[in-house]
């Protein structure tokens, strides 16, 4: 045997022996979850079955695409990348830089933004932290912000606190928070009252954003009010970012200084978030002096190193895919269908005698006012869950309890993804009506002994689980909805 051939054979034998020695370790990283962890695989299969055989009405949920899922489970998650493109604290990030830069470029393109006038940070892990990062970037501890009150359709991350002043969101511990409200007669944001409050409170930031508000937002009026008190206008479009991208609802960008959003709701991407911020000149003084925005460095520093370490590169790659999908004609058609379905759904519920907060909807969600029935939102959510329908209890204007509110929040994005149209949402309205009636009957069977509210709800859950009527309807719904495809055929 030639010397070179002998050396090669020896080397191959060494590699082979090493392979034998490390076969267990190799198996550990190469087995699919079905083989490596059957217990967790069984849980995954259960959730897949639940999603396929349930009606998803939670307006903040959606079914993301197979392409997005591919990136979420990709090798991009293996890389650590503290810092920003071109300015990393670790080597080997040249390709990751391409991914993040592509995501940023697509985000600006999707919303028609000039890169000279707008920037975007795509590293925030989710929506509530993204809002905190903005506040921390432009406010000192103890400075003031205003957001829509939670019972009126706002969000915890907009500074929610109890009427007593007790902070619920830690944001209201770090900053002074004052809520604005809807008009309880119309269910619409009371802009006149907001203007009065803002002039007196003088907030540093006003948040234009909601999580349970079914009407359009007047961003021009928000800008007028913000300018009148010298506040930044931060618009949180987490719920409607897909609708905004498709131009089926008004865009906040023309009037806002900062815009935040999640990417997994109507945008139908992965569970991530983005912060858009203005660049260039903010204003000009009477003497002609230009005042710059100076938001880019502050916000980027707040994200990293202020609050986060390395970004989730697999999520950013998946966001880039979702943003490209959102530029397609098919996506725009989907978003219009979301709104059309929502309005139809609202009409069907109204015909059945249900009262809706604000009287209807202009977007992707509906809030049912159950105060005219014999059950609260918690019980209706409970029985719907037993019937394979996912919805959520929600506070409505005037509610005093977030645990047992009078509202039920429902939406159309997820089931529109699965192909639902008018006929299907008419059927879903009937299922909701049946659920409310069943809940009213079961509530009369609750123990008459004195129990606290939580214990009574637990008794109601037992009644749902023991009801033959609930079991029969649950089976019917599971079989019916299981006929509709789920992305990726899960």
UniProtKB/Swiss-Prot annotation:
InterPro entries from the xrefs? PyrdxlP-dep_Trfase, PyrdxlP-dep_Trfase_major, PyrdxlP-dep_Trfase_small, Ser_HO-MeTrfase, Ser_HO-MeTrfase-like, Ser_HO-MeTrfase_PLP_BS, SHMT-like_dom
- Name the Gene Ontology molecular function terms of this record: glycine hydroxymethyltransferase activity; pyridoxal phosphate binding
**Which EC class does it fall in?**
transferase
Q: Which GO terms describe its biological process?
A: glycine biosynthetic process from serine; one-carbon metabolic process; tetrahydrofolate interconversion; tetrahydrofolate metabolic process
* Pfam families for the chain: SHMT
**According to the UniProt entry, what is the EC number of this protein?**
2.1.2.1
Location comes to:
Mitochondrion
* Cofactors (names): pyridoxal 5'-phosphate
Q: Does the keyword ATP-binding apply?
A: no
Annotated catalysed reactions: (6R)-5,10-methylene-5,6,7,8-tetrahydrofolate + glycine + H2O = (6S)-5,6,7,8-tetrahydrofolate + L-serine
UniProt keywords, alphabetically: Mitochondrion, One-carbon metabolism, Pyridoxal phosphate, Transferase, Transit peptide
- Is Transferase a UniProt keyword of this protein? yes
Residue(s) carrying N6-(pyridoxal phosphate)lysine: 265
Major location category of this protein:
mitochondrion
> Transit peptide residues?
1-20
Q: Which domain of life is it from?
A: Eukaryota
Q: Which family does it belong to?
A: Belongs to the SHMT family.
An additional note in the Swiss-Prot or TrEMBL entry is:
In eukaryotes there are two forms of the enzymes: a cytosolic one and a mitochondrial one.
Functionally, this protein is described as follows: Interconversion of serine and glycine.
Q: How does it assemble?
A: Homotetramer. Interacts with NAP1.
Q: What is this protein called?
A: Serine hydroxymethyltransferase, mitochondrial
Q: Which organism is it from?
A: Saccharomyces cerevisiae (strain ATCC 204508 / S288c)
Query: What taxonomic ancestry is recorded?
Result: Eukaryota, Fungi, Dikarya, Ascomycota, Saccharomycotina
Q: Which gene name belongs to this protein?
A: SHM1
């Amino acid at each position: 045997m030639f010397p070179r051939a002998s050396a090669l054979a020896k080397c191959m034998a060494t590699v082979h022996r090493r392979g034998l020695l490390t076969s267990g370790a190799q198996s550990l990283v190469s087995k699919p979850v079905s083989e490596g962890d059957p217990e967790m695989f069984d849980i995954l299969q259960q959730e897949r079955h639940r999603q396929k055989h349930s009606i998803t009405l939670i307006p903040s949920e959606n079914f993301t695409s197979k392409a997005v899922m591919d990136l979420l489970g990709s090798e991009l998650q293996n890389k650590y990348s503290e810092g920003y493109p071109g300015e990393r604290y670790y080597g080997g990030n040249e390709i990751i830089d391409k991914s993040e830069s592509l995501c940023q470029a697509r985000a600006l393109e999707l919303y028609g933004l000039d890169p000279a006038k707008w920037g975007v940070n795509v590293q925030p892990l989710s929506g509530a932290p993204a809002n905190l990062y903005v506040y921390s970037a432009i406010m000192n501890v103890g400075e003031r912000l205003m957001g829509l009150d939670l019972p009126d359709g706002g969000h915890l991350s907009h500074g929610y606190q109890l009427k007593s002043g007790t902070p619920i969101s830690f944001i209201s511990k770090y900053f002074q928070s004052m809520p604005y409200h809807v008009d309880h007669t119309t269910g619409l944001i009371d802009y006149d009252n907001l203007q009065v409050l803002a002039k007196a409170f003088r907030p540093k930031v006003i948040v234009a954003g909601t999580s349970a508000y079914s009407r359009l937002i007047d961003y021009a009026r928000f800008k007028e009010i913000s300018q009148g008190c010298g506040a930044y206008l931060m618009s949180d479009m987490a719920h409607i970012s897909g609708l905004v991208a498709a131009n089926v609802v008004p865009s906040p960008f023309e009037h806002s200084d900062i815009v935040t959003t999640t990417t997994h709701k109507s945008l139908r991407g992965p569970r991530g978030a983005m912060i858009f911020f203005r660049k260039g000149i903010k204003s000009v003084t009477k003497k002609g002096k230009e005042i710059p925005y100076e938001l880019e460095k502050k916000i980027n520093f707040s994200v990293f190193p202020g609050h986060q370490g390395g970004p989730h590169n697999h999520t950013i790659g998946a966001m880039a895919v979702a943003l490209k999908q959102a530029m397609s004609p098919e996506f725009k058609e989907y978003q219009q269908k979301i709104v059309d379905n929502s309005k139809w759904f609202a009409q069907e519920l109204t015909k059945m005698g249900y009262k809706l907060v604000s009287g209807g909807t202009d977007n992707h969600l509906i809030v049912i006012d159950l105060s005219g029935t014999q059950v609260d939102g918690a019980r209706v959510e409970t029985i719907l869950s037993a019937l394979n329908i996912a919805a959520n209890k929600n506070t409505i204007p005037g509610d005093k309890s977030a645990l047992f509110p009078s509202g039920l929040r429902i939406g159309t994005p997820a089931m529109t993804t699965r192909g639902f149209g008018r006929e299907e949402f008419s059927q879903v309205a009937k299922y909701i009506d049946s659920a409310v009636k069943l809940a009213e009957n079961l509530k009369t069977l609750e123990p008459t002994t004195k129990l606290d509210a939580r214990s009574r709800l637990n008794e109601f859950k037992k009644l749902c689980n023991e009801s033959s009527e609930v079991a029969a309807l649950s089976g019917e719904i599971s079989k019916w909805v299981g006929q509709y495809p789920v992305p990726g055929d899960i």
